[in-house]
Amino acid sequence: MAIKTYKPTTNGRRNMSGFDFSVITKTTPEKSLLAKKSKTGARNAEGRMTVRHHGGGHKQQYRIIDFKRIKDDKTATVKAIEYDPNRTANIALLVYEDGVKSYILAPKGLEAGTKVQSGPDADIKVGNALPLGNIPEGTLIHNIELKPGKGGQLARSAGTSAQILGKDDAGKYVIIRLSSGEVRMIPATSRATIGEVGNAEHSLISWGKAGRSRWRGKTPHVRGSVMNPNDHPHGGGEGKAPVGHPSPMSPWGKKSYGKKTRDKKKPSTKFIVRGRKGK
């Protein structure tokens, strides 16, 4: 979507930008593809906070997205491009030949009226879903399955994609490069969708004021250096005191910069050919 700017009529409006929603063709969601979405305030069943800086936000309904794309040999028509408040990407409403409706992530260039397919014999064109082993090298893909039949898990945010680099000698795995720079092997029978996720301009939005972040369910991110010493390792001292430790610390007293957090014994590590950039 294109970016629109606002006149500086107030301090909050100054430097604010937003979407013009020019690519959105339908403003009301498909009722049969909606689900209830309850807010937890980032608290678990015991009432304890499990994630910081989450809470509040506008009420939303969840759009049920088809991440698996297993309805083979049925051509679907893109009925509309819709806004989804639950993600950065837009979504596309599909209507299959037999009347079944579903939502998919809207890739770049997909328009209302386009025909899309899924399955091993589908054409290599934007919006079609195929097994990775059937997609040629160099193709940009998104909504990538880590395990066959589990549904897409990688490259789902606005503007993201991965690229197919090749296959292993046995043909069991396909080598892809993710947007992070990581190169990894994925089973050739796992599915992915052709193209890159649309709405790449999302990263250019200037939210402008704190209230817009609160509407999105984000609460203030307080610096540890302005807390009391019993609340954070950086807290206390007179004025703008230094950290007081050999390296910056998390609120729980662990090193927060540069420490690797991935489990060394994680089974999927063997599928990573090269780590992320700078790692």
UniProtKB/Swiss-Prot annotation:
SUPFAM superfamilies with a match to the protein in the record: Nucleic acid-binding proteins, Translation proteins SH3-like domain
Protein keywords: Ribonucleoprotein, Ribosomal protein, RNA-binding, rRNA-binding
Gene Ontology annotations for the cellular component aspect, listed alphabetically: large ribosomal subunit
A Pfam short name: Ribosomal_L2_C
User: Which stretches does the entry tag as region Disordered?
Assistant: 211-279
What does the annotation say about its assembly with partners? Answer: Part of the 50S ribosomal subunit. Forms a bridge to the 30S subunit in the 70S ribosome.
Q: What is the name listed in the Swiss-Prot or TrEMBL entry for this protein?
A: Large ribosomal subunit protein uL2
What gene makes this protein? Answer: rplB
